[in-house]
Curated annotation (Swiss-Prot):
TPR repeats: 102-135, 136-169, 170-203, 205-229
Annotated protein name in UniProt: Small glutamine-rich tetratricopeptide repeat-containing protein 2
This protein's UniProt keywords: Chaperone, Cytoplasm, Phosphoprotein, Repeat, TPR repeat
GO CC, alphabetical: cytoplasm; cytosol; membrane; TRC complex
Gene source species: Saccharomyces cerevisiae (strain ATCC 204508 / S288c) (Baker's yeast)
Family, as annotated: Belongs to the SGT family.
Keyword Chaperone included in the entry's annotation: yes
Length: 346
């Protein structure tokens, strides 16, 4: 049985890990190998911590890469020649060079990410995409770089591109969920993180589950907030209605000018005003009269004069007498024409 791609990748990661642990390479070299191991494990869909388990179940039976290569080097030359003649070359040379170039650019981007040089990382991933635009990993990595710079709109676009290229690539949904959550869209983030769990199934890590639970909690908080807002609005409407005057009487002082506000405290005038407002056409009459230039000029004079005008002066004002006659239908007021006084004189 031939080894799977995952098992071969695990062999490589295991080999790099042993070199780093034994300090057989410089610190800069160790950093580069750590980035490489992250990239390889990400590309083949396994965690670095799972390498020993993968190799233990494989046909390699815990062998290291160096042991396997050393065993192969001891194969007789005649057998090597026969094997070489039977190998089919399925990858065109141009394609292999293209992939190698794109992977090198991606590695440079990953190294820039490790150094927190996110702008450089974006540039390198962009170059890799130009070389090989069909690789979902490049878009997902660039989405992570954009999110690190809080450029969440661009991160969403790259994550969606990764998903469209490879719908089974869980990191595309993971990057999308992170960006959507940062944008304040927990419902969409929850949907993306749910997709991650669906794809990974039993292989889902604790980090993936935490992301999902965080988005779920945010959605629940948002729903609770939306539920309380209408209740607060209803309370505000009740308070506003309680602030209106008895019987729905409008603020005539405000309607006719600030100077008349004090007169509205007179009980007799208030009683007359309430009686007037029982007439359905009263407000229409008031609005019509306010279009009269003389009455409007009178109201503006009260508003600009400040204070409450003298009642005797008001009743001697022809415009006001005319307005009262129109509102009260002649009761308690005289029109401005020459109509005689019909009351009995003592």
């Amino acid at each position: 049985m031939s080894a799977s791609k995952e098992e071969i990748a695990a062999l490589i990661v295991n080999y790099f890990s042993s070199i780093v642990e034994k300090k057989e390479i410089s610190e800069d070299g160790a950093d580069s190998l750590n980035v490489a191991m992250d990239c390889i494990s990400e590309a083949f869909g396994f965690e670095r911590e799972a390498v020993s388990g993968i190799l233990g179940k494989s046909e390699f039976k815990g062998q290291h890469l160096a042991d396997i290569l050393n065993s192969a080097s001891r194969v007789p030359e005649s057998n090597k020649k026969d094997d070489a003649e039977n190998v089919e070359i399925n990858i065109p040379e141009d394609d292999a060079e293209t992939k190698a170039k794109a992977e090198d650019l991606k590695m440079q981007g990953n190294k820039a990410m490790a150094n927190k040089d996110y702008e450089l990382a974006i540039n390198k991933y962009t170059e890799a995409i130009k070389v090989l635009p069909t690789n979902a990993i490049y878009y997902a990595n660039r989405a992570a770089a954009h999110s690190s710079l809080k450029e969440y709109d661009q991160a969403v676009k790259d994550a969606e591109s990764a998903i469209s290229i490879d719908p089974s690539y869980f990191r595309g949904y993971s990057r999308l969920g992170f960006a959507k959550y940062a944008q304040g869209k927990p419902e969409e983030a929850l949907e993306a993180y749910k997709k991650v769990l669906d794809i990974e199934g039993d292989n889902a890590t604790e980090a993936m589950k935490r992301d999902y639970e965080s988005a779920k909690k945010k959605v629940e908080q948002s729903l609770n907030l939306e539920k309380t807002v209408p209740e607060q609005s209803r309370d505000a409407d009740v308070d506003a209605s309680q602030g209106a005057s008895a019987g729905g009487l409008p603020d005539l002082g405000s309607l006719l000018g600030g100077g008349l506000g004090g007169l509205m405290n007179n009980p007799q005038l208030m009683q007359a005003a309430q009686k007037m407002m029982s007439n359905p056409g009263a407000m229409q009459n008031i609005q019509k009269m306010m279009q009269d230039p003389s009455i409007r000029q009178m109201a503006e004079g009260f508003a600009s004069g400040g204070g409450t005008p003298n009642l005797s002066d008001l009743m001697n004002n022809p415009a006001l007498r005319n307005m009262a006659g129109n509102l009260f239908g002649g009761a308690g007021a005289q029109s401005t024409d020459e109509t005689p006084d019909n009351e009995n004189k003592q």
